[in-house]
Amino acid sequence: MTQYETVIGLEVHVQLNTKSKMFCRCSTDYTSAEPNTHVCPVCLGMPGVLPTINKQAVEYTIMSGLALGCDIASFSKFDRKNYNYPDLMKGYQISQYDQPLCGKGFMDINIDGAIRRIGITRIHLEEDVAKLHHESDINGQPYSLLDINRSSIPLMEIVSEPDMRTPEEARQYLMKLRTIMRYLGVSTANMEDGSFRCDANISIRPEGSPELGAKVEVKNMNSFKAVFSALEYEEVRQRKMADEGKKISQETRGWQDDKCQTVSQRSKEFAHDYRYFPEPDLPPLHISCDWIEAIRAKLPELPEVRKERFIQGYWLSEYDASLLTASRELADYFEAVLSEADFQNIPQDKGIKEVANWVVGPVSSIMNTAGADINAFTLKVSPASLCRLLVLVSAGKVNAATAKAVLEDMYSTGQNAETIIEKKGLSQISDSSELVSIAKKVLADNPKAVAEYNEGKTQVIGFLVGQMMKQSKGRANPNIAMELLKKALEEG
């Protein structure tokens, strides 16, 4: 049986985070606005109007190209892409065809410890289309409504080379690309609200063959999971067809998430079907070296570089560094806590590790439970506030378990740690004389555990410490509790 290789390339559409649209001054805030309120004659496609280029969108595209190692064009232009669809207000889309802003680039992804370099073919700038809302009337007859607020939102298309060989590589590529876009601040890059959209081109070929097979474009994927599942399904479908001697058609297929399958939508278009020609109402762009270097100077530290710095400079594991740098804001928060910290009483590497554990542990857990991001968390728990809580833990004022509960209260109330601890009486009990009586009661209440300890099952001490924590309502110093229990057990 013939062995096949899967070939995948991705076209990622990224809505740019500008205040105004690509070719007019209308607001880009289309998600929270009433339908068809952020419109004007330009984005409505009225005859006789002239578009103007959004400079910020051009800069964001160049910045993205620099972050992905792309060649930046010194000359670029816009073109008309002609096709007929209800969401296209002018009857054509202003896009870029043969002279995009950014040329060849690349992005490295990590697959099971091996680095795979995925080529970037180009990055071009265009305008988004309006949004169709499909509804049904009282008789069940379908109809569609059109919201033109989204029309002409700046849209950047990042086209990869067909360098991915598995659905997992495609997913990893998308996840890393989204992280980079967010680090740059050029887009919110949320798949769920459509600001980060992906079309996938997938084909198969016999292993070792240099020729590409018939390309199938897959659309309607609105999550990383959907991209993975759609490509996995399509990979199996195409291989089955090839094994059965059936011809694979070049077509566009849509992913049906509820049925976990792709369905044919139309035959795949070729470039000449769109009848591209230069946009006559917009001047070409001349991009100087000085402008490019000025944009390069604005580039933030990118996630891969920051992760390596965290590993080398903060002695963190690759796992912890990856979690902390997955979000620029989370990494900023971590470093802000470190800047507030005083590691005079403990080794610096141990202190840094403790801060990292709290940020990737309790802090992230609270955010996930609340459905909040780090910006919302910071409004309630500043880096200085978290640092102060960790100082209280280090000084033995509260134990770690109690501190986690205090942190939850800090987030829900906005109060500082000291206020919450005092109000709820949560200060850790470190006075041996106070803990001795609790230890004696625990031993008296658990004769079976005492007998097991005396028989050499020393791990039972953990259970007894837990009972002391329960008796003290979480306030006992666990280290002192363990010492007292061991002493009492050894003395018989």
Swiss-Prot record:
GO terms for biological process: glutaminyl-tRNAGln biosynthesis via transamidation; translation. One of its GO terms (molecular function) is glutaminyl-tRNA synthase (glutamine-hydrolyzing) activity. Its EC number is 6.3.5.-. The keyword Nucleotide-binding applies. Keywords: ATP-binding, Ligase, Nucleotide-binding, Protein biosynthesis. The keyword ATP-binding applies. It is an enzyme of class 6 (ligase). It catalyses: L-glutamyl-tRNA(Gln) + L-glutamine + ATP + H2O = L-glutaminyl-tRNA(Gln) + L-glutamate + ADP + phosphate + H(+); L-aspartyl-tRNA(Asn) + L-glutamine + ATP + H2O = L-asparaginyl-tRNA(Asn) + L-glutamate + ADP + phosphate + 2 H(+). InterPro entries: Asn/Gln-tRNA_amidoTrfase_suB/E (IPR017959), Asn/Gln-tRNA_Trfase_suB/E_cat (IPR006075), Asn/Gln_amidotransferase (IPR018027), Asn/Gln_tRNA_amidoTrase-B-like (IPR003789), GatB (IPR004413), GatB_C_1 (IPR042114), GatB_Yqey_C_2 (IPR023168), Gln-tRNA_amidoTrfase_suB_CS (IPR017958). Pfam families: GatB_N, GatB_Yqey. PANTHER family: GLUTAMYL-TRNA GLN AMIDOTRANSFERASE SUBUNIT B MITOCHONDRIAL AND PROKARYOTIC PET112-RELATED (PTHR11659), GLUTAMYL-TRNA(GLN) AMIDOTRANSFERASE SUBUNIT B, MITOCHONDRIAL (PTHR11659:SF0). Belongs to the GatB/GatE family. GatB subfamily. Heterotrimer of A, B and C subunits. Allows the formation of correctly charged Asn-tRNA(Asn) or Gln-tRNA(Gln) through the transamidation of misacylated Asp-tRNA(Asn) or Glu-tRNA(Gln) in organisms which lack either or both of asparaginyl-tRNA or glutaminyl-tRNA synthetases. The reaction takes place in the presence of glutamine and ATP through an activated phospho-Asp-tRNA(Asn) or phospho-Glu-tRNA(Gln). This is Aspartyl/glutamyl-tRNA(Asn/Gln) amidotransferase subunit B. The gene is gatB.
